[in-house]
Amino acid sequence: PLLTMNRTRAEYDDLTPAERAVKLGRAGAPALGVTVRLSEQGEILARANMVMDGYWEQPDATADAIVDGFFHTGDGGGIDDEHYVSILDRKKDVIITGGENVSSIEVEDAVFSHPAVAEVAVIGVPHEKWGETVLALVVLAPGASADEAEIIEHCRGRLAHYKCPTVVEFRAELARTATGKLQKFKLRAPYWEGKERLVN
């Protein structure tokens, strides 16, 4: 359903292109008739007449998705003082390491800024002490070279220490859908086989 929308606003006319880009880069303000709020965990929740009543013949999935009339989108984000919504990461892609929440997208941006990196996916993998640790799966650009220590050090100059990958694995390719979207559930699966993911 349509939950938010970006509208052309007269006050944008006086903004610089950079300021306008920030405002228009958000997911938008709640559409007419939609109530949006954040859960205590930072998940975006929405309530509106057009939100589904539930999943067809899937009562457990419905109970997880709709609580107290609010649809749990699965997106983590924020709401600013203009009531505009920003989506920061998928809830299931947030890594919880040592009690700290780490956005996989933020780490991917840091890794991707290394000139040798062509593709990257960041996932949480089991760690005996911290619950999860940050793993970066990297595809290098043709003819480029980099090692694990170099990628980690690159990230340490851009991120808080706990957000940096502790492990970097190099791959020839990453699992994607036919439309090119990363399939993180497939990338995570081998690491969590035989383990219950209790931290997320």
How would you name each of these model-derived features?
Residues 26-33, 39-68, 82, 100:
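Conserved ATP/PPi-binding loop(s) of AMP-dependent carboxylate-activating enzymes
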Residues 189-200:
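Acidic/polar alpha-helix N-cap and adjacent early helical turns
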Residues 3, 166-167, 185:
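Extracytoplasmic/periplasmic beta-strand context in beta-sandwich domains
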Residues 27-30, 129, 164-167:
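Short loop/turn motifs at secondary-structure junctions and domain boundaries
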Residues 1-25, 29-32, 58-61:
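Active-site loops of AMP-binding adenylate-forming
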Residues 38, 48, 53-54, 74-163, ...:
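AMP-binding/adenylate-forming catalytic core of the ANL superfamily
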Residues 122, 169-170:
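Hydrophobic/anchoring residues in structured secondary elements
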Residues 43, 119, 166-167:
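Residues at the N-termini of beta-strands
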